[in-house]
Swiss-Prot record:
Keyword NAD: yes
Molecular function GO labels: flavin adenine dinucleotide binding
Species: Streptococcus mutans serotype c (strain ATCC 700610 / UA159)
Pfam families with a match to the protein in the record: GIDA, GIDA_C_1st, SAM_GIDA_C
Claim: NAD is one of the keywords in the record: yes
Gene, per the UniProt record: mnmG
Name by which UniProt lists this protein: tRNA uridine 5-carboxymethylaminomethyl modification enzyme MnmG
Cofactor(s), by name: FAD
């Protein structure tokens, strides 16, 4: 078929949520003429659910996006109302930053960034069809029958893809927050031969701030110590007048109301068909699944400085409106709360992610990428992380440059993408620190050291940012070298000072670095013996030094495991391999290999249902093929 295109682009991004924004900013900043199409301009970077960015594992993802040259970290640093570092009483591997957002300001700032970006066109438009010829993307068609050409299309439609809102017995076609659903495009993706799944998520009621009895709840203030998501943010800009959140709980009365009305709950009446999130269940689901618990935590989270709306985190529900009101009024502090919005569930289509490569390009159609909730994940941060990777790879493909594949040892983003494309997901996927086997080297404090070089190589990290990164890296490297070379000897004067501090004296000579491995010895104490660095060090560099030194043994073990896995990842599997020609592998392994088509031995080894014997047989088969080709 011959198409008459009215406009020509390098990349078209469908959907302007958190994935779409990062994808379009990446492609345009890498020099590709990009169209970002959204059903509603007012929904750009909107937060239809929780008004927050970051949290366990997710906060590290935001730091990774920032290190690659993305926008989420910079934007939340300009629009938060509260900032907290989580898990400070635990080890460095699980510490993560979380910000309470002014959601309107966040969306407004991001829209301004997109509007000012060179090479990027922002347009309110419903995309109904992805145009494909000979297995390759050539463009899109809009609902108004305009056709735009493109070498790559990135689908980031979120929960709008055949979205349906469910509230009690009411069910209607809708995207998030009562925006339009994308139905024709959902049909088109299925017609293109992609396997489609159906997921569900939900959101809680919002109540009016001035109707809450805060004196009956527990205050949750922000941190006084400055922290930021972006490495470009400055401590002097850290917000002093932060807005607190508040903690309350459900009680037996709340549970009784829910239990009496379970027959009216769409979750249990059969109205909800989609699979919901395991780690963010609705309140009615929690009451049933955890019947032994007499209360559940609820956090009252302000949605911004210029709104009275307060989000009740932990009370996600699709119960009928009258039941929601009764539940809200049964909660301490909310007895007279005015409900401004009801909670609801939303069902939506997803592209089953085993059909994707680690670049987030579909295996079936060249130039077609998907990212975000379209791939079955939950969360703004997971979406943004996929968005920037899809955007980078779309641009690299068009430019004829090597693709970017983030490994599990590179980033939490790499862990997430590998999980999705290798294992798939049967429920909305959420990143957890427990999913990362190398979490001690995937920390909040070293994201820039891990990924800024990559961001610079692909063209997303500018020279100012790169210079600041090099200064920080040089400070770290130089001071680590210095601490590794200076020795403390067990002489009387030094041991006297150590004993005066209440610590055990030295019995052998130690380097300053070895001295710092003692749990009680921090950088300040160590340098009081060996002298300060040649230049004043940033506090964050000092914290990084302490972590790297104190956990060096564990970090080195992790790096040894990474080296072993790297050898597995370097053993590539031919695209045209005949899985049926391999004798002796288990039937389940053969079926999984056919479904997923792993690209490396490492990826094949991580597929569920595949055992070490199957991998050994596969490696022997490939080695035999290689020998026969070299004869």
């Amino acid at each position: 078929m011959t198409h008459e295109f009215t406009e020509n682009y390098d990349v078209i991004v469908i959907g302007a949520g958190h994935a779409g924004v990062e994808a379009s900013l990446a492609t345009s900043r890498m020099g590709c003429k990009t169209l970002l199409a959204t059903i509603n301009l007012e929904m750009l970077a909107f937060m239809p659910c929780n008004p927050s960015i970051g949290g366990s594992a997710k906060g590290i993802v935001v730091r990774e996006i920032d290190a690659l040259g993305g926008e989420m970290g910079k934007n939340i640093d300009k629009s938060y109302i509260q900032m907290r570092m989580l898990n400070t009483g635990k080890g460095p591997a699980v510490r993560a930053l979380r910000a309470q957002a002014d959601k309107a300001l966040y969306a407004r700032n991001m829209k301004h960034t997109v509007e000012q970006q060179e090479n990027l066109t922002l347009r309110q438009s419903m995309i109904d069809e992805i145009l494909v010829e000979d297995g390759k993307v050539i463009g899109v068609r809009t609902a108004t029958n305009q056709k735009y050409s493109a070498q790559a299309v990135i689908v980031t439609t979120g929960t709008a893809l055949r979205g349906e809102i469910i509230l009690g017995e009411l069910k209607y076609s809708s995207g998030p927050n009562n925006s339009l659903a994308s139905v024709t495009l959902a049909d088109n993706l299925r017609d293109l031969g992609l396997e489609i799944g159906r997921f569900k998520t939900g959101t809680p009621p919002r109540v009016k701030a001035n109707s809450i009895h805060y004196d009956e709840t527990e205050i949750q203030p922000g941190d006084k110590k400055a922290n930021h998501f972006s490495f470009m943010s400055k401590d002097e800009d850290y917000l002093k007048d932060q807005i607190p959140c508040w903690l309350t709980y459900t009680n037996q009365s709340s549970h009784d109301i829910i239990n009496k009305n379970l027959y009216r709950a769409p979750m249990f009446s059969g109205i909800v068909k989609g699979v919901g999130p395991r780690y963010c269940p609705s309140i009615e689901d929690k009451i049933v699944r955890f019947a032994d618990k007499d209360r559940h935590q609820l956090f009252l989270e302000p949605e911004g400085r210029e709104t009275e709306e307060v989000y009740i985190q932990g009370l996600s529900t699709s119960l009928p409106e009258d039941v929601q009101k009764d539940v809200v009024h049964s909660i301490k502090g909310l007895e007279n709360a005015e409900m401004m919005r009801t909670g609801y569930a939303i069902e939506y289509d997803i592209v089953l992610p085993h059909q994707l490569r680690a670049t987030l390009e579909t295996k079936k159609i060249s130039g077609l990428f998907t990212a975000g909730q379209t791939n079955g994940t939950s969360g703004y941060e997971e979406a943004a992380g996929q968005g920037i990777v899809a955007g980078i790879n779309a641009a690299l493909k068009i430019q004829g440059k090597p693709e970017l594949i983030l490994k599990r040892s590179d980033a939490y983003i790499g862990v997430m993408i590998d999980d999705l494309v290798t294992k798939g997901t049967l429920e909305p996927y959420r990143l957890l620190t427990s999913r990362a086997e190398y979490r001690l080297i995937l920390r909040h404090d070293n994201a820039d050291l891990r990924l800024t070089e990559i961001g610079h190589q692909v063209g997303l990290v500018n020279e100012e940012r790169y210079m600041r990164f090099q200064i920080r890296k040089n400070q770290f490297d130089n001071e680590l070298t210095r601490l590794s070379s200076i020795k403390l000897k067990p002489v009387a004067e030094i041991n006297k000072r150590i004993e005066e501090l209440g610590f055990k004296p030295l019995t052998d000579a130690l380097t300053a670095k070895e001295f710092m491995r003692r749990p009680e010895i921090n950088y300040a104490i160590a340098t009081s013996f060996v002298g300060p660095a040649a230049e004043s060090l940033d506090e964050k560099v000092i914290e990084l030094l302490e972590t790297e030194i104190k956990y060096e043994g564990y970090i080195n073990k992790a790096l040894d495991q990474v080296a072993k896995m790297k050898r597995m990842e370097e053993k590539r599997i031919p695209k045209n391999i005949d899985w049926d020609a391999i004798d002796s592998i288990a039937t389940e392994a053969r079926q999984k290999f056919k479904k997923i088509n792993p690209e490396t031995i490492g990826q094949a080894s991580r597929i569920s249902g595949v055992n070490p014997a199957d991998i050994s047989i596969l490696m022997v088969y490939l080695e035999g093929k290689n020998r026969s080709r070299t004869r």
